A protein has these predicted regions:
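Cytosolic juxtamembrane N-terminal segment immediately preceding the first transmembrane helix
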Residues: 2-47
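Extracytoplasmic
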Residues: 33-61, 65-67
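Residue-level signature of mid-helix packing/kink "hotspots" within the transmembrane helices
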Residues: 50, 78-86, 136, 170-171
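Small-residue (Gly/Pro/Ala) motifs that create kinks and tight helix-helix packing interfaces
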Residues: 56, 169, 173-178
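Membrane-interface helix termini in secondary transporters
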Residues: 58, 89-90, 179
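Conserved MFS/SLC helix-loop-helix module at the cytosolic interface between two early adjacent transmembrane helices
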Residues: 83-119
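Short hydrophobic/alpha-helical segments at membrane-entry points of transmembrane helices
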Residues: 120-128
Length: 179
């Protein structure tokens, strides 16, 4: 019986390189690529979590949900997101983080689209909670990438660069959703 979790397996080791110059060149290029990908990727994933905060007023004004109901929906995301970050961090340590992160973003995007098909409170609470779970794939994969590619002495600097993604994502949310 096929194991669906094999998709997330970290894969076989690459062959060992002996040429020091080639190793240094490849390592430097890979590190730059890693920091750019995790920063841009997380920045683009962030709006999938913030979209509800932008559309709350129209939902209330349209009589679709009350402020209390939106509070329940929003709480579902944050409670499940917190738990997801905790548990998904353990999973990310042993997973192919490219696939793990991409799956989280893809499922989160699909959930955001699915929310437009219903105005039932319980459906929104469940979907927004699931969105929180899959959003919880993001930060752990970024942390794993940082710890795999940057030394203890460098992590603060590169974590600072990566943390720009939160602001980029928040700005993107208002650019894309608000108009």
């Amino acid at each position: 019986m096929p194991n669906p979790f094999r998709f997330f397996a970290s894969g076989k080791d690459k062959p060992t390189l002996d040429d020091r110059e080639k190793i240094d060149k490849l390592y430097k290029r890979s590190r730059l690529s890693i920091i750019l990908v995790i920063t841009i990727g997380y920045g683009f994933a962030y709006p999938l979590r913030l979209v509800l905060s932008v559309i709350k007023k129209p939902l209330i004004d349209g009589g679709i949900f009350s402020a209390d109901e939106l509070g329940m929906i929003g709480s579902a995301l944050f409670y499940v997101y917190a738990f997801g970050k905790l548990t998904n961090g353990f999973l990310a340590d042993h997973a192919n983080i490219k696939r793990f992160f991409a799956t989280g973003v893809l499922v989160s995007a699909l959930i955001n689209l699915a929310m437009g098909w219903s105005t039932l409170l319980w459906v929104w609470v469940i979907l927004w909670g699931l969105n929180g779970w899959f959003q919880g794939f993001g930060a752990p994969t970024g942390a794993v990438a940082l710890s795999n590619w940057f030394s203890n002495r460098e992590r603060g600097r590169y974590y600072g660069i990566w943390s720009v993604a939160h602001s980029v994502g928040e700005g993107l949310t208002f650019l894309v959703v608000a108009p």
